[in-house]
């Protein structure tokens, strides 16, 4: 497996709200680990966006090409620099529904267009389809650093300090994701409340009108 350079990890998994000078594009990068339930050696790799395909679509195609044994279960963990867009979220849900022997977990360093309703709905769609989406914290950044980065040459930064910095920055992003997830809980609670209250009668409608 080709490994990431320490510089690529530092730049692309950078989860600061704003990039410091000199500015650079924070690209979509996906690191995946496929672990068979029988205890065999995990398969790892990483993918990035290409002109026509997002990293998530390339990941789906990569897993399909492996010809996995459908009688065996696999744990799949993905570390993404950006959370999936709505289109990719839908594709991932369809993929997992068609491949019940795969258990997919997604961890993102940053939330992509998190303020847009359709991007929030994409995240909720994944979570509601048994595809957990979480923000990367210290355990995930550490695992990504240890298993997907080439350590032949010493990095230009202190790895421990970098990982602690990433974990510190992730706290606000985690709270942001929890607020998004709470929307689905609110919608469900409101729906149940409406069912319990039953239809609004004409008289009550008049009393509650403004």
Curated annotation (Swiss-Prot):
<dbReference type="GO" id="GO:0016554">
    <property type="term" value="P:cytidine to uridine editing"/>
</dbReference>
<dbReference type="GO" id="GO:0000932">
    <property type="term" value="C:P-body"/>
</dbReference>
<dbReference type="InterPro" id="IPR016192">
    <property type="entry name" value="APOBEC/CMP_deaminase_Zn-bd"/>
</dbReference>
<feature type="domain" description="CMP/dCMP-type deaminase">
    <location>
        <begin position="4"/>
        <end position="126"/>
    </location>
</feature>
<keyword id="KW-0051">Antiviral defense</keyword>
<feature type="active site" description="Proton donor">
    <location>
        <position position="56"/>
    </location>
</feature>
<feature type="region of interest" description="Necessary and sufficient for localization to the cytoplasm">
    <location>
        <begin position="182"/>
        <end position="210"/>
    </location>
</feature>
<dbReference type="InterPro" id="IPR041512">
    <property type="entry name" value="APOBEC3H"/>
</dbReference>
<dbReference type="Pfam" id="PF18771">
    <property type="entry name" value="APOBEC3"/>
</dbReference>
<dbReference type="InterPro" id="IPR016193">
    <property type="entry name" value="Cytidine_deaminase-like"/>
</dbReference>
<feature type="binding site">
    <location>
        <position position="54"/>
    </location>
    <ligand>
        <name>Zn(2+)</name>
    </ligand>
</feature>
<protein>
    <recommendedName>
        <fullName>DNA dC-&gt;dU-editing enzyme APOBEC-3H</fullName>
        <ecNumber>3.5.4.38</ecNumber>
    </recommendedName>
</protein>
<dbReference type="GO" id="GO:0004126">
    <property type="term" value="F:cytidine deaminase activity"/>
</dbReference>
<dbReference type="GO" id="GO:0005737">
    <property type="term" value="C:cytoplasm"/>
</dbReference>
<comment type="similarity">
    <text>Belongs to the cytidine and deoxycytidylate deaminase family.</text>
</comment>
<comment type="subunit">
    <text>Homodimer.</text>
</comment>
<keyword id="KW-0479">Metal-binding</keyword>
<keyword id="KW-0391">Immunity</keyword>
<comment type="function">
    <text>DNA deaminase (cytidine deaminase) which acts as an inhibitor of retrovirus replication and retrotransposon mobility via deaminase-dependent and -independent mechanisms. Exhibits antiviral activity against vif-deficient HIV-1. After the penetration of retroviral nucleocapsids into target cells of infection and the initiation of reverse transcription, it can induce the conversion of cytosine to uracil in the minus-sense single-strand viral DNA, leading to G-to-A hypermutations in the subsequent plus-strand viral DNA.</text>
</comment>
<keyword id="KW-0862">Zinc</keyword>
<feature type="binding site">
    <location>
        <position position="88"/>
    </location>
    <ligand>
        <name>Zn(2+)</name>
    </ligand>
</feature>
<dbReference type="GO" id="GO:0051607">
    <property type="term" value="P:defense response to virus"/>
</dbReference>
<dbReference type="GO" id="GO:0008270">
    <property type="term" value="F:zinc ion binding"/>
</dbReference>
<dbReference type="GO" id="GO:0045087">
    <property type="term" value="P:innate immune response"/>
</dbReference>
<keyword id="KW-0378">Hydrolase</keyword>
<feature type="binding site">
    <location>
        <position position="85"/>
    </location>
    <ligand>
        <name>Zn(2+)</name>
    </ligand>
</feature>
<keyword id="KW-0963">Cytoplasm</keyword>
<dbReference type="InterPro" id="IPR002125">
    <property type="entry name" value="CMP_dCMP_dom"/>
</dbReference>
<keyword id="KW-0399">Innate immunity</keyword>
<dbReference type="InterPro" id="IPR050610">
    <property type="entry name" value="APOBEC_Cyt_Deaminase"/>
</dbReference>
<dbReference type="GO" id="GO:0005634">
    <property type="term" value="C:nucleus"/>
</dbReference>
<dbReference type="GO" id="GO:0003723">
    <property type="term" value="F:RNA binding"/>
</dbReference>
<dbReference type="GO" id="GO:0070383">
    <property type="term" value="P:DNA cytosine deamination"/>
</dbReference>
<dbReference type="GO" id="GO:0045869">
    <property type="term" value="P:negative regulation of single stranded viral RNA replication via double stranded DNA intermediate"/>
</dbReference>
């Amino acid at each position: 497996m080709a490994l990431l350079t320490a510089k690529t990890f530092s730049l692309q998994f950078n989860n600061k709200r704003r990039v410091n000078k000199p500015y650079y594009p924070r690209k979509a990068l996906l690191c995946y680990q496929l672990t068979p339930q029988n205890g065999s050696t995990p398969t790892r790799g990483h993918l990035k966006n290409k002109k026509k395909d997002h990293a998530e679509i390339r990941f789906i195609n990569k897993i399909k090409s492996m010809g996995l044994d459908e009688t065996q279960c696999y744990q799949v963990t993905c570390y993404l620099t950006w959370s999936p867009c709505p289109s990719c979220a839908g594709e991932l849900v369809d993929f997992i529904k068609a491949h019940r022997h795969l258990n997919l977990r997604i961890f993102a360093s940053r939330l992509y267009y998190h303020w847009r309703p359709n991007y929030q709905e994409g995240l909720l769609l994944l979570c509601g389809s048994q595809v957990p989406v979480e923000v990367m914290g210290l355990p995930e950044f550490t695992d990504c650093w240890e298993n997907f980065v080439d350590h032949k040459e010493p990095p230009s930064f202190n790895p421990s300090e970098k990982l602690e910095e990433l974990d510190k920055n992730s706290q606000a992003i985690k709270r942001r994701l929890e607020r998004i997830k709470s929307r689905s809980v609110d919608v469900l609670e409101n729906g149940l409340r409406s069912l319990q209250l039953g239809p609004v009668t004409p008289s009550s409608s008049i009393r509650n009108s403004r």
